[in-house]
């Protein structure tokens, strides 16, 4: 294996962060969150990957605002009530010297159609061919709010 991938198990520096190897786990939806909160099942899932030697884990979809949800089992991080679960998850992964980062996400027109959800938003009022109804074009003001939500 080293003949073809001589640097795979070597550390790599990304900005100011050093990752122990070049084995990265991409975001893969598990739908194991409970109303956006990290569950014990999620902690076990990600810590098992860290224990197996992954250098960097990118979590699954993590919503940054409360109105639109991609799938009901997705994780969230739009207010401080989510911090204890995230801390438990991060601590579990860090015990194996694995780095972890959240895939911050807003579903826009792909949001799950939960009753009471307002009309879906998108960059324009043209949605995908499979959508039951067209989204509403996001306003400049809403875009500023979304940018702030990603930053918080």
Q: Which positions does each model-derived feature cover?
A:
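Flavin-dependent oxidoreductase catalytic cores
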Residues: 1-152
């Amino acid at each position: 294996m080293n003949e073809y991938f001589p640097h795979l198990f070597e550390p790599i520096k990304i900005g100011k962060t050093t990752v122990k190897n070049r084995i990265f786990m991409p975001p893969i939806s598990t739908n194991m969150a409970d109303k956006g909160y990290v569950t014990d099942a999620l902690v076990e899932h990600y810590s098992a990957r860290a224990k197996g030697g992954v250098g960097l884990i990118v979590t699954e979809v993590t919503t940054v605002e409360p109105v639109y949800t991609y799938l009901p089992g997705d994780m969230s991080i739009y207010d401080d009530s989510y911090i204890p679960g995230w801390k438990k998850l991060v601590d579990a992964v860090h015990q194996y010297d694995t780095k972890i980062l959240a895939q911050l996400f807003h579903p826009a027109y792909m949001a799950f159609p939960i009753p009471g959800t307002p009309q879906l938003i998108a960059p324009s009022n043209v949605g995908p061919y499979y959508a039951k109804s067209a989204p509403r074009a996001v306003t400049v003001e809403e875009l500023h709010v979304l940018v702030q939500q990603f930053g918080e």
